[in-house]
Amino acid sequence: MCGIVGIVDRDLTRAVLPSELEQMVRTLVHRGPDEEGTITVAGVGLGMRRLAIVDLATGQQPILNETGDIKVVANGEIYNFREIQRELEQHGHRFRSRHSDIEVLVHAYEQWGEDFLPKLGGMFALVIWDGRTRTLMAARDRTGEKPLYWTNT
């Protein structure tokens, strides 16, 4: 079971220190022993610990779109990702991996905005940073199988 973390400065003015994010990610080592990933930009930091189950070789996170302005971290599994991937390819999206269910999320958000969420079948918690609009979106599966906690401080 993976784990995701994030820090967002309310005004997006205070830089997130990599050491802050790395400390948070270290607390999740029991949830994902296989790898960790972090990214910081514009008052936002996203991180994750991964238990590699799907796409063992190329499923590293955070996952970015081609231009790097949309970033995703997620925990879970998207059962219908191949179907969504085929539809996105018809819209011109290119994938680095044919096997990453999480990579589908960044392209689906890019194509449909938050309207992509009802298309997802599976269990997931995800966070998306959209650098184009400077907005953060967090979501989880309909039944809450993958929990998502957040707070304002």
Features from the language model and the residues they span:
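N-terminus-centric sequence/structural signature that marks the extreme N-terminus
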Residues: M1-T153
